[in-house]
Amino acid sequence: MVELREATEAEYLDIIAMTNRAFREPAGQVDWKVETLIDGQRVDESLLRQDLAEPGARLLIWRDAAGAHTGHVRLDDDGDGAWYLAMLTVRPDRQDGGLGRTLLAAAEAFARARGGKRMRMTVVHQRRELIGWYERRGYTRTGETEPFPYGDDRFGRPTQAGLYFDVLEKAL
C-alpha cells in the first residue's frame, strides 16, 4: 500500500529536480515517458509555488520503506467532487515496475477519501502513448482542449507548433 503525505517546503527542490529528470531527460528512457516535444524544464520553483498557492492544491510525496523519494503527484481539489491531477512522477530509475499505476491509484484513493467523484487532467494531445496509458486506467477524453502556454518558458520550450492539451476524466 502506498502512503502519500503532504510534501514539505524542504522537499520542493528534490521534487522539482526529479520531475524535470522524469519528464525531460530522455537518456535511457522510451519516448512515451518523456516529453520530447518540449525542451527545457517541466517545472521550476516559482511555478510550483504558484500552483500550490491555489486553493485546494496539494503536493503529495511517496517514499519507499527505506525512506527514498519514489514519486510524487500534485492534486487540486476543484470543488464539487472534481479533482485535478498533475505532475504524476516516478523516479526514472524505478520506472517500468508498475509504480506509476500504483501512484495513480493512490492519488485517486486520496481524492476519493476526501469526497472526490471524478479526476481530471490535461495531457499534450500529441503524446498518444501517454494518453493511451491513462485510457487503459479508465480515463476518457472529454472532447475539451486547452491551449499550450507558448511563450511561458516555465513550462518548457515547445519544439514544434500546434501543441495543445486534451482534457481527460475518470469517475472515481
What do the PLM-derived regions correspond to, one by one?
Residues 44-61, 161-164:
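A short helix-loop-beta-strand connector motif used in the catalytic cores of GNAT acetyltransferases and
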Residues 20-49:
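Conserved GNAT-fold acetyl-CoA-binding loop/helix
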Residues 90, 96-109, 136:
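Conserved acetyl-CoA-binding loop-helix of GNAT-fold acetyltransferases
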Residues 3-17, 24:
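A short beta-loop-alpha structural element at the N-terminal edge
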Residues 63, 88-95, 123-125:
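A short, internal acetyl-CoA/4′-phosphopantetheine-binding micro-motif in the GNAT/acyltransferase core
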Residues 117, 124-131, 137, 144-172:
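C-terminal "cap" of GNAT-fold acetyltransferases
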